[in-house]
Amino acid sequence: MNVTAYVVLSGILFTIGCVGVLIRRNAIVVFMCVELMLNASNLALVAFARQHGNLDGQIAAFFVMVVAAAEVVVGLAIIMTIFRTRRSASVDDASLLKY
């Protein structure tokens, strides 16, 4: 399989994630769409690294996965706090956390 197929798949996944972030109001779904966008960028990084025959893209993808793991911890903690205080996981309720 050539790199073009992986890049097209990565673009499709990134677009789906972008549309999900812009359209959805549920914080958990938005969070999953952000993770989908990060995984799409990882796929593109690994595909380009494979094409050029070096490990730089794979190392960058590894660091993106490490940052995504930290993001999962912080993001889920914020979503749980929103749900505990407002009994809703809507993104609109996130601005109410300061009160």
UniProtKB/Swiss-Prot annotation:
Ranges annotated as spanning the membrane: 3-23, 28-48, 59-79
Cellular-component GO terms for this entry: NADH dehydrogenase complex; plasma membrane
Membrane topology: Multi-pass membrane protein
Catalytic activity: a quinone + NADH + 5 H(+)(in) = a quinol + NAD(+) + 4 H(+)(out)
Domain of life: Bacteria
Database matches in InterPro entries: NADH_UbQ_OxRdtase_chain4L/K, NUOK/Mnh_C1-like
GO molecular function: NADH:ubiquinone reductase (non-electrogenic) activity; quinone binding
EC code(s) of this entry: 7.1.1.-
One GO-annotated biological process of the protein: ATP synthesis coupled electron transport
Subcellular location: Cell membrane
This protein's UniProt keywords: Cell membrane, Membrane, NAD, Quinone, Translocase, Transmembrane, Transmembrane helix, Transport
Main location: membrane
Enzyme class (EC, first level): translocase
HAMAP family: NDH1_NuoK (MF_01456)
Database matches in NCBIfam families: PRK05715.1-2, PRK05715.1-3
Self-association state and partner proteins as the record states: NDH-1 is composed of 14 different subunits. Subunits NuoA, H, J, K, L, M, N constitute the membrane sector of the complex.
Function statement: NDH-1 shuttles electrons from NADH, via FMN and iron-sulfur (Fe-S) centers, to quinones in the respiratory chain. The immediate electron acceptor for the enzyme in this species is believed to be a menaquinone. Couples the redox reaction to proton translocation (for every two electrons transferred, four hydrogen ions are translocated across the cytoplasmic membrane), and thus conserves the redox energy in a proton gradient.
Family from the record: Belongs to the complex I subunit 4L family.
Protein name per Swiss-Prot or TrEMBL: NADH-quinone oxidoreductase subunit K
Natural source organism: Nocardioides sp. (strain ATCC BAA-499 / JS614)
Gene that this sequence comes from: nuoK
